[in-house]
Amino acid sequence: MDEAVGDLKQALPCVAEAPTVHVEVHQRSCSTAKKEDIKLSVRKLLNRHNIVFGDYKWNEFDDPFLARNVQSVSIVDTELKVKDPQPIDLGACTIALHVFQLNEGGPSSETLEEETENITAASHWVLPAAEFHGLWDSLVYDVEVKSHLLDYVMTTLLFSDKNVDSNLIAWNRVVLLHGPPGTGKTSLCKALAQKLTIRLSSRYQYGQLIEINSHSLFSKWFSESGKLVTKMFQKIQDLIDDKDALVFVLIDEVESLTAARNACRAGTEPSDAIRVVNAVLTQIDQIKRHCNVVILTTSNITERIDVAFVDRADIRQYIGPPSAAAIFKIYLSCLEELMKCQIIYPRQQLLTLRELEMIGFIENNVSKLSLLLSEISRKSEGLSGRVLRKLPFLAHALYIQAPTVTIEGFLQALSLAVDKQFEERKKLSSCI
C-alpha cells in the first residue's frame, strides 16, 4: 500500500518537492526485456541531456539495448499548464518513468442476450491500445482541461489509498464532459483512459475501457431492459474485481438517460424505459465504490442532462469549439505530419504563435507563411475539431491532387477548403 501511495504522490504536483517530469517509454511489442533494465538504460540516456526544451522525443538510440527494445522515449505533458515550451533542468527534477507496451488486439464487443437477438451493448479495449496511441497529443484545448482531468483522477486514487472517509469528503469517480458535437469529448475520454493506464503502469498491470452503447440500452427490443443492464454491469464488475486492472467505464451521449426518463414521465415511453435509467444509475452507484474504477461520460446537449446524474459528477467540464489559437496548433500539427510524409515538400520551418507575438506579427520572409496560417486559423473559428482535422485531407483532394505540393500551395488550398466548408454549412442551414 505504501508503495502504491508513493507512486501516486510522484504523479501528483507537490509545492514542497522538486517538480516531477513524466517520461513515457514505449517498449517494442516484440521486446521481452525487463522493465527495470529498460528504466536503467533510459536514465543513462536522460543523464546525458541536462536541459530539454518542453516536451521532447527520442526515436533513435546509440545504445544497442534501447535500439532493440524501445520504440521511443518521450518527455511528456510539460506544456499542459504553460502556454509555451520552457527549458527544463532534468537534474533538478524528479523523473517518473512509465514503461508500456501497446495492445494490438483492437476492440471486442460485449453482447447481451435478448429473446430474439443478441444486442451489442458495449465495446471493450485492453489498454494501452495501439488504436489510441498519439490520441492525447492530437487533442488541443485553450484551457487546462487535460491537466485538470489528470489531476482529478490522480487525487481520486490517492484519497482512496489514504482511506479518506467519503462521508466527510465526497467524491464519486464520475467525470462529465459536455458541449457541442465534434469537439473531441469522446476522444478525450479514451485518450485520458490511455494516458492514466500508462501513468499508473507501475501500479496496475493494464487498463480496461468499456464504452457503453447508450442507444442499445433503450432499444425497443428490450422487454426486460433493467435486468439486461444489470447483466452488463455484472460483466463490468467482473473486470473491476481484478485489482491488477484500472477500469474505465465510458457512457457516451449520457443525455439518452434523461430523454428516456422525461419521455416516460410525459407518458410517451413505456415504464420499461424508466427502469433502464434507474438501473444504470443504481449500477453506477455500486461500481463507483471501488478504488480501481473511473466513470467517464459525455453529453452533446447540456440542458437535457438529468439532475440526478449531474449530481453524481465530480467534474463537469465544458468542451467548446477551439479558438483561433488552438486551431493554429491543430493546423500546425497537420502541416508537420504532411511535411514528415513529404506530401508537402520541401520542408519549411513555421513559427509558433508565441514566436509571432515576439516579433510583433511583422511580415518578413521568415514569418510570411506562419502569418498566412494564422489568418486561415482566424477564419476557421466556429468549426469543430473533428472538421478541422479533416480539412487538410479535403484541401488536398479538392484543390491539389498531386503527389507533392509546396507549403505555399497547400496553404492556399487549405484556405479554399475552409471557405467551402462555411459555404456548405450555409446551404445546409438554409434548407432546414
Swiss-Prot record:
Superkingdom as given in the UniProt entry: Eukaryota
Residues carrying N-acetylmethionine: M1
CDD domains attached to this UniProt entry: RecA-like_Pch2-like (cd19508)
Example of a GO MF term: identical protein binding
PANTHER family referenced in this protein's UniProt entry, alphabetically: PACHYTENE CHECKPOINT PROTEIN 2, PACHYTENE CHECKPOINT PROTEIN 2 HOMOLOG
Protein family: Belongs to the AAA ATPase family. PCH2 subfamily.
UniProt name for this protein: Pachytene checkpoint protein 2 homolog
Organism: Canis lupus familiaris
GN (gene name): TRIP13
